[in-house]
Amino acid sequence: MTSNTPVSDQLFDRARSLMPGGVNSPVRAFGSVGGTPKFMVSAKGAYLTDADGKEYVDLVCSWGPALLGHAHPAVLDAVHAAVDRGLSFGASTPDEANLAAIVKDRVSAVERLRMVSTGTEATMTAVRLARGFTGRNLIIKFAGCYHGHLDGLLAAAGSGVATLALPGSAGVTEATAAETLVLPYNDLAAVEAAFAAHGKNIAAVITEAAPANMGVVTPGEGFNAGLSRITKEHGALLILDEVLTGFRTGYAGYWGLTGRQEGWAPDLLTFGKVIGGGMPTAALGGRADVMDYLAPVGPVYQAGTLSGNPVAMAAGVATLTNATPEVYAYVDARSLELSAALSSALDAAGVDHSIQRAGNLFSVAFGTSAHGVHNYDDAQRQESFRYAPFFHSMLDSGVYLPPSVFEAWFLSAAHDDAAMNRIVDALPAAAKAAAGASA
């Protein structure tokens, strides 16, 4: 079979001789869908262009950051101006406080904010901070929730770990793993039991605000509020991981859509992706008394040469300034439109499925209409073999989907009628391909 992207093929062959698996993040290798990954050379609005000159409507959006669309003029202008002033100073800059003020204004649970460069750094620091603040060692996480690649939270992780069917990661010591209690998601009774057995030693519960790394999973009614109640009762902290959902699912993140109205707040939150507008930026924030345990005012150490990088801060300020309530309303409407079209095409092809949704994020789970997906076990039981032919049919039609059934679909403010029509027109053939798949 002749490839229709020979330049990407050549680039991948070269990359495999230079980098493990030819990639710098495993999901990019197309491991669960097969075929050669496409090498992208440019992005504009709702579109990606690969090294062979082929254009795709993008439903990955850089895994979330491109909320406004790729290469948004206001973001580019801010970045260009920042670059002209210098790339990195090794000192504080005005936009660090400007971005922190925007986050604090939008997310009332944030009283202090610390900038870092990656989501993994944010969750790693939040866990260290929780242990330092409480004087306890154990952390509760949920199977299928992904919090970056720090050792203690890779047990039963979602995302690329789920894609590769790995239970965790080699290189994580037994002693490190023993300090993490892994519980089933959406099961408050299991959380209550864990605190009954280990409560005096539990520093924190960490959870994705709405999981999106085992496919999208909606927190059950009262689940996150219940975590807040239980942690408070036992003197532990609740860490809400909004690296993916923060400023993507809503103006104040997923907590702003749900928790604020329900009357509870996490002790710490982590942010990434959208907060940097496509630049490597992340943050952790929360209660002032907890955050002030960080150095230089507290005993918990954290540092980073490129934390608060001026170019990244400029991109973040421009992105959040332009991410208005109207933008979220538009993306929400497009998300509902596309998920309805997806479900209709799968129904017409006779493919059993459920659409999993959290705000404007959604994913499809095959063979799950009877029970849906509420936790990691449900996600693993789906007919995931149907996704690869579905993915490649869409790819051949010029639509770039996440190369894993365990990832969310992302839309942006740049997905106009032309982009949406191209996606919708490609769905019937992809649905038929999924229908014809066999395990």
Swiss-Prot record:
Primary localisation category: cytoplasm
A Gene Ontology term for the protein's cellular component: cytoplasm
Pfam families (alphabetical): Aminotran_3
Keyword match tRNA processing: no
Domain of life: Bacteria
Pathway(s) annotated for this protein in UniProt: Porphyrin-containing compound metabolism; protoporphyrin-IX biosynthesis; 5-aminolevulinate from L-glutamyl-tRNA(Glu): step 2/2
Catalytic activity of the protein: (S)-4-amino-5-oxopentanoate = 5-aminolevulinate
Cellular location(s): Cytoplasm
GO-annotated biological processes: protoporphyrinogen IX biosynthetic process
Named cofactor requirement(s): pyridoxal 5'-phosphate
Alphabetical keyword list: Cytoplasm, Isomerase, Porphyrin biosynthesis, Pyridoxal phosphate
One GO MF term: glutamate-1-semialdehyde 2,1-aminomutase activity
EC number: 5.4.3.8
Positions carrying N6-(pyridoxal phosphate)lysine: 273
Subunit structure: Homodimer.
Family: Belongs to the class-III pyridoxal-phosphate-dependent aminotransferase family. HemL subfamily.
HAMAP family referenced in this protein's UniProt entry, alphabetically: HemL_aminotrans_3 (MF_00375)
Designated name of the protein: Glutamate-1-semialdehyde 2,1-aminomutase
Organism (species): Paenarthrobacter aurescens (strain TC1)
Gene behind the chain: hemL
